[in-house]
């Protein structure tokens, strides 16, 4: 009998594969919508092990406290503005309809009040490129243009932590801890590189699958690897 696959072992929910959720400070999102323009103070900058971007703990003048991805250059004690009448300066939170064209923004809401969904990674940002009626056209980090409602909020500037990939990992032990804290299974060994006892694609005198890579949706867990319930594989015929 063969050994269990990686996804079968992970499915048991043992500490080896479980996310260390207790070490994360909390969700990073905007507070509930408010039509007023309020000021907030950055009281703490936090390293979240599950993210590459540092978090800023902000306390508004009405006492509401929330976490947000820190903008580049943000510091403890900084006063930021939150609302439609805020100035378009780095760290301030405004509706997209109030942000001038050509401005770099991040942590953009897809729908007003959802807390922020787009351009949240360290060093990534979206660019306000135009208007289309009740929507603002954004150029996303992928290069695609997307229309977002004018009432959706965004933070002015660029998320802190840019340039993180410039530092080499150097050794496998660093990579182990990097992915362990982010709830990612690592290392990811190819099935064809395994022995026959470890994977349906393993074994043989050279690395090859040795069987069709497509598998039925109803296949048992030990066989369910490869292209699951695929309509086609490879390039589409012209």
Curated annotation (Swiss-Prot):
Keywords: Ribonucleoprotein, Ribosomal protein, RNA-binding, rRNA-binding
Gene3D superfamilies: 2.30.30.30, Nucleic acid-binding proteins, Ribosomal protein L2, domain 3
Gene Ontology molecular-function annotations: rRNA binding; structural constituent of ribosome
Region feature Disordered, mapped onto this chain: 1-34, 197-238
CC terms in the record's Gene Ontology section: cytosolic large ribosomal subunit
GO biological process: cytoplasmic translation
Stored InterPro entries: NA-bd_OB-fold, Rib_uL2_dom2, Ribosomal_uL2, Ribosomal_uL2_arc_euk, Ribosomal_uL2_C, Ribosomal_uL2_CS, Ribosomal_uL2_dom3, Ribosomal_uL2_RNA-bd_dom
Keyword Ribosomal protein: yes
Annotated disulfide bonds: none
Keyword Acyltransferase applies: no
Compositional bias per record (Basic residues), positions renumbered to this chain: 224-238
Function noted in UniProt: One of the primary rRNA binding proteins. Required for association of the 30S and 50S subunits to form the 70S ribosome, for tRNA binding and peptide bond formation. It has been suggested to have peptidyltransferase activity; this is somewhat controversial. Makes several contacts with the 16S rRNA in the 70S ribosome.
Similarity field: Belongs to the universal ribosomal protein uL2 family.
Oligomeric and partner information: Part of the 50S ribosomal subunit. Forms a bridge to the 30S subunit in the 70S ribosome.
Name listed for the protein in its UniProt record: Large ribosomal subunit protein uL2
């Amino acid at each position: 009998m063969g050994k269990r696959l990686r996804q079968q072992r992970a499915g048991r929910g043992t500490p080896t594969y479980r996310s260390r959720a207790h070490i994360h400070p909390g969700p990073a999102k905007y507070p509930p919508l408010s039509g007023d323009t309020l000021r907030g103070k950055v009281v703490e900058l936090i390293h979240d092990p599950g993210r590459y971007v540092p978090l800023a703990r902000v306390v508004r003048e009405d006492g509401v406290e929330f976490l947000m991805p820190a903008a580049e250059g943000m510091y403890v004690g900084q006063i930021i503005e939150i609302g439609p009448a805020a100035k378009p300066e780095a760290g301030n939170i405004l509706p997209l309809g109030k942000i001038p064209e050509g401005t770099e923004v991040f942590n953009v809401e897809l729908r007003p009040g959802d807390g922020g969904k787009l351009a949240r990674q360290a060093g990534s940002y979206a660019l306000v490129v135009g208007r289309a009626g009740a929507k603002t056209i954004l150029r996303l980090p992928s290069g695609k243009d997307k229309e977002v409602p004018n009432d959706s909020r965004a933070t002015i500037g660029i998320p802190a932590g840019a340039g993180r990939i410039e530092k080499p990992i150097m050794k496998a032990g660093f990579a182990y801890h990097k992915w362990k804290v982010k709830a990612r299974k690592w290392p990811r060994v190819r099935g064809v590189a395994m022995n026959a006892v470890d994977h349906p694609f393993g074994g043989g005198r050279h690395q090859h699958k040795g069987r069709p890579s497509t598998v039925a949706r109803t296949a048992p867990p030990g066989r369910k690897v490869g292209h699951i319930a695929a309509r086609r594989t490879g390039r589409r015929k012209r």
